[in-house]
């Protein structure tokens, strides 16, 4: 069974790493600071039991989670990127956690009058009753997280 608090802490540690991309770079990843997250992810994959964990020259992190059944099953891959847009800062991310979202406006930043409202983003209502992780209005972070109860792996 998943430990919700550990997942939340892990996610928050990821979003606090500045991974802002550089549009003028001709390398992949476009900044050295993106390697920090790649290395962290690789270490954590090893810690939860994945094998063949590696980071290639482009900072792609790969690993294998061995099957836990005897019969042949299809393989699955999860692919994502960890750079963030240079259009807004990725430094000093200050996530806000909204437990048991009530379907009302979420004040991201009272001082700047930044509000996330289902009046403008009606898909927010799909997440009523769930935990939301949002920006404080000063960075790009806006993630809706839904923690389910998969059977593997134990995190």
Predicted regions and their residues:
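Acidic/His- and Gly-rich active-site-bordering loop/insert found
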Residues: 3-134
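Single conserved hydrophobic/aromatic residue that forms the stacking wall/gate
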Residues: 145-149, 153-155
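A short glycine/serine-rich beta->alpha loop
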Residues: 133-143
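Conserved acidic functional residues
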Residues: 81, 143-144
